[in-house]
């Protein structure tokens, strides 16, 4: 079986829950040909990516899929691209709030996800859930993590992707119930 390292962030911005990690925890241990290795990561610039890289060095995954919260979205959205910028409107969980800084000095402006984002979005929709491709992972820790991982695994066989999920109903609107978010992630993984 192939190995999928799937991550979810801890709560940030004053929240007490993060639907990304909560949904990851609900996923089965295997989906299709993948064994899932689940990892909670901190919402901290640089540290989130290094936490993923450390785990990847231990387990040697075939695919890394990070899951993050995007409270303003009404769909589960595989990300098409990571961009080489850190620019935070709020501080991360250790108080860092970089503005207009490159993630990798002199690195490419953007790096495309190496997972099949269209097939993943289509699989989510086919499961009867809201799914769409996103063309921006923002400029907060989610994008920082996506870009760092894409840069690190360039020219390797490890595929890297990111999916943003909506708030839970108790967090605000738009939202998606936790069970539906987990079902959407399972559908996306089935399209890898």
What are these model-derived regions, one by one?
Residues 1-137, 151-155, 175-180, 189-192:
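N-terminal catalytic or cofactor-binding beta/alpha core of small enzyme domains
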Residues 141:
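Catalytic beta-strand/loop cores that center a nucleophilic Ser/Cys/Thr
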Residues 144-190:
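Active-site-adjacent mobile loop/cap segments within catalytic or ligand-binding domains
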């Amino acid at each position: 079986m192939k190995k999928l390292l799937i991550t979810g962030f801890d709560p940030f911005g004053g929240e007490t829950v993060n639907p990304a990690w909560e949904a990851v925890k609900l996923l089965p241990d295997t989906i299709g040909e993948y064994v899932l290795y689940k990892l909670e990561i901190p919402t901290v610039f640089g540290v989130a990516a290094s936490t993923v890289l450390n785990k990847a060095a231990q387990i040697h995954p075939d695919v890394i899929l990070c899951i993050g919260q995007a409270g303003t979205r009404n769909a589960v959205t595989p990300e098409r691209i990571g961009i080489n910028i850190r620019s935070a409107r709020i501080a991360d969980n250790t108080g860092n709030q970089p503005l207009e800084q490159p993630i990798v000095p002199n690195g490419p402006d953007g790096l495309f996800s190496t997972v099949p984002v269209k097939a993943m979005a289509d699989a989510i929709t086919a499961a009867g859930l809201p799914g769409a491709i996103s063309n921006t992972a923002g400029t907060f820790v989610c994008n920082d993590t996506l870009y760092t991982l894409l840069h690190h695994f360039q020219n390797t066989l490890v595929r890297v992707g990111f999916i943003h999920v909506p708030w839970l109903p108790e967090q605000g609107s738009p939202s998606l119930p936790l069970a539906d978010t987990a079902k959407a992630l399972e559908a996306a993984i089935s399209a890898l």
